[in-house]
Amino acid sequence: MQPFIHLHVHSQYSILDGQASIPALVDKAIRDGMKGLALTDHGNMFGIKEFFNLVKKKNGATKDAIKGVQKRIEAIESGAEEVEDKEKELASLQEEKAKLEAKIFKPIFGCEMYVARRRLTDKEATPREIRTTVVNEVEGFSIRRGAVDEGGYHLVVLAKNLKGYHNLVKLVSKGWTDGFYSRPRTDKYELEKYHEGLIVCSACLGGEIPRRILTGDIQGAEEAILWFKNIFGEDYYLELQRHKATVPRANHETYPLQQVVNDRLIEFSRKHGIKLVCTNDVHFVEEENAEAHDRLICLSTGKDLDDPNRMLYTKQEWLKTQQEMNDIFSDVPEALSNTLEILDKVEFYSIDHPPLMPTFPIPENFGTEEEYRKKFTEELLYCKLI
């Protein structure tokens, strides 16, 4: 079995779309022996601090044990602790340390961003001639081109180090403050500006590459791939998904479209030397949670459960085990193992920091902040007393 981790995961912080709690996601990933997990909520990073704190707590005992082993290693090497067979003891301790380090669970901080088709500041009402829907038939299914500024293309963006985390925060924040139009959006100009320390995956059928493929714009898809490769280099991956619906009341159109996209992505991967990864676009934890998630989608779209025309998911979007993902992608094992390559690229880093307190200038005649505070405290106290 190829080792695997999930890189495309939505929690309850993907508001009215994700149904999974962060503790449940992390607990299942750890139980299954996964070495890490990414959190990529839609357009936001609301859950990142909870995710960080939870994983930090779960890793606490193991990290303390590693520190204890390291202290013994240093003591033996320096001669502070004498042992009968120094080399044998050090080798044993190094082995113990390696086993402990292998137990550390790595959080990957990310976001499934929306990338504007033009600039993030473009928010005009779309002209009628552009707004008119164009339909393309692909493998018997209708693919629609939407309004030019509507929502944006999906893109999975992961921070591989602290610099990347800061850049991701900038991109997401700017998407809300400057790029919001139906959704918080970034654009390619911003991605190029803040690309350092980021890993990017091409996302689901809502991504630019899949959409271009499904509308017959193969040249445009290839040009977009080469743009991302030029900016992100070895940190750009083409993302495969396979959601074959197995129950009647589910979206059965998605899987054939994914297969069309996957075939092209594999072709582009070989042609341009871009690595593949597989994901499951996780929205809930267990298979049996699909019905609860279905009802959540009814709430978010304002539709009745028995509406024949309402939005449906494939009901395959649970946090699948490594074995389940191996069964689905057995023909492309590199797409499984490359998820571990991304995990190895991601550094351990802390997003904790001390409180950021405001700084107020103190008039020179008061000297110190303490003297300034004392003067006004006494004055206000006196006023209260009289």
Which sequence ranges carry the predicted segments?
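Phosphodiester-processing cores and adjacent nucleic acid-binding clamps
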Residues: 1-386
